[in-house]
Amino acid sequence: MESFASLAGGGSSSTTARLPELISPENPDHISPPPLLYQLLAGPESSARQHGHDGHHHGGGGGEAAAAAVQGQVSPAGAEAAVKAEIMSHPQYSALLAAYLGCKKVGAPPDVLTKLTAVPAAQQLDEADGHPRRRHEPQRDDDPDQLDQFMDAYCSMLTRYREELERPILEAAEFFSRVETQLDSLAESNCEGTGSSEEEQDPSDKQLKHQLLRKYGGSLGDLRQVFSKRTKKGKLPKEARQKLLHWWELHYKWPYPSEMEKMTLAQTTGLDQKQINNWFINQRKRHWKPTPVAGTAFPTMEAAGGGFRHSGHGGGLAAAAALPLYMGRPFVVDGMYRLGS
């Protein structure tokens, strides 16, 4: 058959796209020659075959064909032009053209898609120039509703054909969309827990961070100071231990600080009195062992305000008075303080 594009373009020969041949509605109960509309749209070969078939049944029909020509019957070429004119002037021609162009747009490249989109605009301009699409009364002896049935049938056929063409494309697009979603979820799960740099932060996040720092900066500083004072595994800060050791070296003969000295050490080291007391107790137990003279009782004192505990039979007060005489200067062994003569 001739392509429907020739109808869309007013019979232009530049369009080469073709659709399947037009098939008349199925009627298995009554077999008759196809109507003139379907014969003409099926192509000149079909029309010629039909006319030859009619001529064969009429006994060659040479004289009758001449008589028909004399009587003014329309030739096949003239009938085809008349059918095209009726189709293009039918009210549903725009819908038929849109359905056909919809089939051509499926999977078309961008340049072809642009050209196909411009076709309805050209048809509207044609109508604005004085060629409106209006219904012509049939000038033939065919059924008046035949053209309406033809337009409805082929609009529905082209719509179904376009849906069949779009189905694999839509399925492929849905498949790729699912794959993309899965890849995005995998990428997001791999990136969880990784911190972003200052340059990658959102401006709103930076502004919120600055506001929180201005509001809670003082409290954060206090918390940082408190956490810095906390010791790990009972170890005091290095600076505090150095200050305590300096006091220890200065008072190695009697390493028992008074309450006032403890308060002063607490202020200078940043420790509390409990930590200072514990440090001096451990330091005296580990590194302060005065050597007693043979035959002389030596008292020991467990705390600054504690009483004396005597060993031997000597006088405790006399031994306590002579206590500094048995203490020499300290010396270091393996980093630990020792007292000797």
Swiss-Prot record:
Family in the record: Belongs to the TALE/KNOX homeobox family.
Stretches assigned to the ELK domain: 207-227
Described purpose of this protein according to its UniProt entry: Probable transcription factor that may be involved in shoot formation during embryogenesis.
Compositionally biased intervals (Polar residues): 187-196
The entry's keywords: DNA-binding, Homeobox, Nucleus
InterPro entries with a match to the protein in the record: ELK_dom, HD, Homeobox_CS, Homeodomain-like_sf, KN_HD, KNOX1, KNOX2, TALE_homeobox
Protein name per the record: Homeobox protein knotted-1-like 8
Subcellular location, principal: nucleus
Keyword Nucleus (UniProt): yes
Disordered: region residues: 1-72, 121-148, 187-207
GO molecular function terms attached to this record: DNA binding; DNA-binding transcription factor activity, RNA polymerase II-specific
DNA-binding region per Swiss-Prot/TrEMBL record: 228-291
Sequence ranges of Low complexity compositional bias: 1-17
